[in-house]
């Protein structure tokens, strides 16, 4: 998606290394979503695998309120994206984010791969403990 958004047309990419976010590790964009994305998305970013465990753990441990959210590896990028965006002045300006903004984060899966989820949760919990 990132490459296609950047060049403004469907673009296939060769995947050099698979991501732990298996559902997002695709070489091309599906045609139906592309019809929507090409005319409505102005900004796009890529999330590294290393950032996933901490977000999975923060969501699971209720760091953002009273709710505990079981968010798998393809849901955590929503949290990472808003965190990165709010901590970068240029991105905040580009997205017109401020204290009055309302942001909807969509998580597209829970713990669909329980072994991977537990591994990410354990690693992320360790990161939280180590500060």
Where would I find each of the regions flagged by the language model?
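Active-site-adjacent helical/loop segments in soluble small-molecule enzymes
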Residues: 30-96
């Amino acid at each position: 998606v990132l490459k296609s958004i950047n060049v403004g047309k469907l673009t296939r990419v060769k995947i050099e290394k698979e991501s732990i976010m298996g559902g997002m590790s695709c070489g091309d964009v599906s045609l139906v979503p592309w019809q929507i994305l090409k005319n409505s998305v102005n900004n796009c970013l890529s999330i590294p695998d290393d950032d996933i465990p901490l977000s999975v753990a923060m969501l699971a441990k209720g760091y953002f309120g009273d709710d505990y959210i079981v968010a798998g590896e393809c849901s955590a990028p929503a949290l990472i994206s808003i965190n990165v965006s709010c901590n970068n002045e240029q991105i905040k300006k580009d997205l017109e984010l401020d204290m009055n903004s309302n942001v909807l984060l969509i998580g597209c899966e829970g713990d669909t791969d329980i072994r991977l989820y537990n591994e990410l949760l354990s690693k992320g919990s360790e990161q939280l403990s180590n500060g």
